[in-house]
């Protein structure tokens, strides 16, 4: 076991910290339950706990919002999301353990008596589009983008960054013609013409 070898040499891996806020209860393999519902200012679960989680129960969640960017996540939860909303820090290219957490949460929300809406708020750039696609393909097939459209790019144009790389523009062109990214076609077209990303 790699971890045992590292421990033998005095090297310990730190657990990943996963952030969210919303009415969730985690049931561990040993039957203990952890209720996060009261932690409306932000909750945390570490990767070791996720490894030993048997299931997640959602309580009246009608909307699940994954947020890529930590600054956006902190701002969003400071606005006091509705009680029926679950907000999860996506944090970029997720690890296998974070993928397990997302899957447990998704399964818990799917077991509710009513359907929830699943949204992803990522950067309006190549990475954000790829992260959306990966989450949709691997875990949440109902996923829809949030604030990743032409209107958002126009609204926050003053915060946009210039695209100077021809290779980046070529990647956008390929995405614009790829049915896997069809939901972003309009915003990608604007990005290519104006050479900006958000």
Q: What is each residue range found by the language model?
A:
Residues 113-125:
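Acidic beta-strand-to-loop metal/phosphate-binding motif
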Residues 1-89, 94-108, 127, 133-137, ...:
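Nucleic-acid enzyme cleavage-core boundary/entry regions
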């Amino acid at each position: 076991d790699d971890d045992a070898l590292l421990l033998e040499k005095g090297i310990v891996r730190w657990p990943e910290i996963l952030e969210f806020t919303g009415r969730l209860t985690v049931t561990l393999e040993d039957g203990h339950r952890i209720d996060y519902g009261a932690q409306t200012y932000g909750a945390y679960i570490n990767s070791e706990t996720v490894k030993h989680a048997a299931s997640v129960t959602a309580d009246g969640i009608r909307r699940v919002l994954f947020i890529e960017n930590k600054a956006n996540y902190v701002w969003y939860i400071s606005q006091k999301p509705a009680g029926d909303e679950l907000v999860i820090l996506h944090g970029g290219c997720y690890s296998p353990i974070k993928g397990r957490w997302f899957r447990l949460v998704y399964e818990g929300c799917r077991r509710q008596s009513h359907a929830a809406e699943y949204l992803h708020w990522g950067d309006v750039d190549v990475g954000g589009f790829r992260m959306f696609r990966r989450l949709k393909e691997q875990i949440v097939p109902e996923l829809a983008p949030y604030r990743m459209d032409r209107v958002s790019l126009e609204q926050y144009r003053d915060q946009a960054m210039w695209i100077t790389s021809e290779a980046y523009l070529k990647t956008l062109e390929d995405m614009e013609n790829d049915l896997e990214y069809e939901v972003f076609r309009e915003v990608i077209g604007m990005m290519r013409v104006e050479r900006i990303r958000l």
